[in-house]
A protein has these predicted regions:
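Acidic, Ser/Thr- and Gly-enriched intrinsically disordered low-complexity segments
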Residues: 1-219
């Protein structure tokens, strides 16, 4: 895809995987093409529930549960135009990229083997397997710790050996807050930075005057 001379470089969105303990980067998945749309929703954590307790009407228990939904396209078309420079795409199509995305939603084979060995040895307690912490990166102002809640892959084109060469990937992500991770967890501190960035951006908008609503004051 050509660009106009002098046009600003388009940043890529994607997912960065970090070690939940040390915070060290363990991998990164850059979207080949940025999604055209990004849907977000918020579930308010109201303190009063539906009971009608008047003292709780404006209270919240914690951060709203924020969710993202996005669709990304993965294609080998550009790579297959230059087969000598892209032997992996020629041999496997986009299976490596899809496999990397699938690794976000399941434990590794090494973790499964390790837990099975613990079970065979008679271990009384086997902890659930911990995956790397995914961070949704959408520009410098939005870096959020997330959990993948939904992954759907529609393979749309194949090579003669049935390797997929184009697919649409639908991702559902839930932002992990300090309610999920705690303040001492690396993800908790990343969430606080994400929330504080939003607060700083909100302060850039001046408060509207009541006159714009046709009001001279409140009743």
């Amino acid at each position: 895809m050509s660009t106009f001379p002098g046009s600003p470089k388009l940043l890529k969105g994607g997912i960065v995987l970090v070690d939940p303990g040390s915070g060290a980067v363990r991998g990164a998945i850059a979207f080949q093409y940025n999604p055209e749309t990004l849907s977000r929703s918020f579930q308010v954590q109201a303190a009063g529930g539906e009971g009608g307790d008047r003292s709780q009407a404006l209270r919240v228990k914690g951060p709203a549960v924020e969710s993202y939904k996005l669709d990304v396209v993965v294609s080998a078309a550009d790579q297959l135009e230059h087969p000598s420079e892209n032997p992996t795409a020629v041999e496997h199509g986009i299976l490596p990229q899809l496999s990397l995305l699938e690794s976000l939603v399941q434990p590794s084979s090494a973790q499964l083997i390790s837990n099975n060995a613990l079970a065979d040895s008679g271990a009384l307690e086997i902890l659930p397997m911990e995956t790397p912490l995914p961070l949704l990166v959408w520009g410098r102002s939005r870096i959020a710790p997330v959990r993948v809640t939904d992954l759907s892959i529609t393979e749309e084109a194949f090579d003669p050996l049935l390797h997929p060469i184009q697919a649409k990937v639908s991702l559902g992500l839930r932002v992990l807050s300090v309610d999920d991770l705690g303040f001492s967890h690396k993800g908790g501190s990343l969430f606080m930075a994400y929330l504080q960035q939003k607060e700083q951006l909100a302060k850039r908008i001046p408060a509207a005057s009541l006159s714009v609503f046709g009001l001279g004051g409140l009743p």
